[in-house]
């Protein structure tokens, strides 16, 4: 006899799925993608965390926490600053006003 698996359809945002508000989830999603870009850049440049931290003007323990996903104490602005220090260009684009949209969104494309 086959077991029936129960599942729940995803909202499309893992942070909403685990209970964060949509606003918190949006911010956490942006931070996650920026951290992913930082990790990728450090890896591609073959930097140690100590070297990367020096470039980003922070210390290795702080950078390590961030790279492991501890995002509560870091801002999107700081993450963008780390990326630019590492040689990446961070673009911020504001789209035109749309009266049909209740609220705008934070979106990252990395």
Model-assigned labels for residue ranges:
Residues 42-44:
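Short amphipathic helical patch at the helix-1/turn junction of helix-turn-helix
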Residues 67, 94:
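DNA major-groove recognition helix of helix-turn-helix
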Residues 30, 34, 59-63, 75-79:
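Amphipathic alpha-helical interface surfaces
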Residues 47-64:
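Short alpha-helical DNA-recognition segment
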Residues 76-93:
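DNA major-groove recognition helix of helix-turn-helix/homeodomain DNA-binding modules
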Residues 1-36, 97-110:
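N-terminal flexible/basic segments that precede or flank functional cores
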